[in-house]
Amino acid sequence: PVTLNEVAHSIFYAPQYTAIELGYFEEEGILLTLDTGFGADKTMTALISGNADIGFMGSEASIYTYKEGNEDFAINFAQLTQRAGNFLVSREQYDSFSWSQLKGSTVIGGRKGGMPEMVFEYILKKNGLTPQKDVTIIQNIDFGSTAAAFSSDTSLSDYTVEFEPHATLLELSGDGYVVASLGVDSGYVPYT
């Protein structure tokens, strides 16, 4: 048996779920167990501790583990996604959106040093904005709680960065509007 610990359970990883459901792993003689770590740090912990055989996460976790001097570090060997899978959600609906509109705003971002946050900051810089100077980024909200924080406290931020299904759920509830795709605006990156 092989235990795969994924960073998050998301439609973004549909190819993996399809392969599991269609029995492709079993056809190759792999009995796969799927666990969810809810964050690259937790997925890496599961991998290093032996609770997972494969960690499905962004490459940054491997780099951090190596830089900490761990002798039992992870080796990146495959790539499932080549773009960010998250979206910028605004409290306001725009006919036309430009990243420059974020100047002076507050955004619920991701964990400092995590792949979602690094890609978001890359896009800001690419559009002439300096993170934490031109745009205030909240980085202390748990990955699974950002959408709830955005919808429950309208004074907290102007925007949030969300994966599916949270981006769509915010739209359906009337609490936010998807205004940009980080995957489109960042271009190709070795995401997970």
Describe the predicted segments one by one.
Residues G144-T192:
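Pocket-lining segment of extracytoplasmic ligand-binding domains
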Residues P1, T65-F77, K125, L169-G183:
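Ligand-binding "clamshell"
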Residues P1-S10, I30-T36, G104-I108, T136-I138:
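Short, well-ordered beta-strand elements
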Residues I30-L32, I48-E60, G69-A74, S105-I108, ...:
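Alpha-to-beta junction loops
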Residues H9-Y13, Q79-V89, G110-L124, G144, ...:
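Extracytoplasmic ligand-binding site segments that recognize negatively charged/polar headgroups
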